Amino acid sequence: MGEISITKLLVVAALIILVFGTKKLRTLGGDLGSAIKGFKKAMNEDDDSAKKTTAEEEAPAQKLSHKE
């Protein structure tokens, strides 16, 4: 009774398509895909900025000389 079979999944999928329609599901899928793409892009930018900051911190400091 608690198992999820393939027939149950197909019935649920058919009901979802009937309720929302294919156009709404296509739009929802596109929105979800662009959200995931934006999230991955933000994560990569964050990693790049962290690497840049780490490289700047590891670089030796230059001596400043002051002439009077």
Curated annotation (Swiss-Prot):
Its main location: membrane. It comes from the Bacteria. GO terms for molecular function: protein transmembrane transporter activity. Keywords: Cell inner membrane, Cell membrane, Membrane, Protein transport, Translocation, Transmembrane, Transmembrane helix, Transport. The chain crosses the membrane at residues 1-21. Residues 43-68 are annotated as: Disordered. GO terms for biological process: protein transport by the Tat complex. It is found in: Cell inner membrane. It is a single-pass membrane protein. The keyword Transmembrane helix applies. It holds the Pfam family TatA_B_E. One of its GO terms (cellular component) is TAT protein transport complex. Belongs to the TatA/E family. TatE subfamily. Part of the twin-arginine translocation (Tat) system that transports large folded proteins containing a characteristic twin-arginine motif in their signal peptide across membranes. TatE shares overlapping functions with TatA. NCBIfam families: PRK01614.1, PRK03625.1, tatAE. This is Probable Sec-independent protein translocase protein TatE. It comes from Klebsiella pneumoniae subsp. pneumoniae (strain ATCC 700721 / MGH 78578).
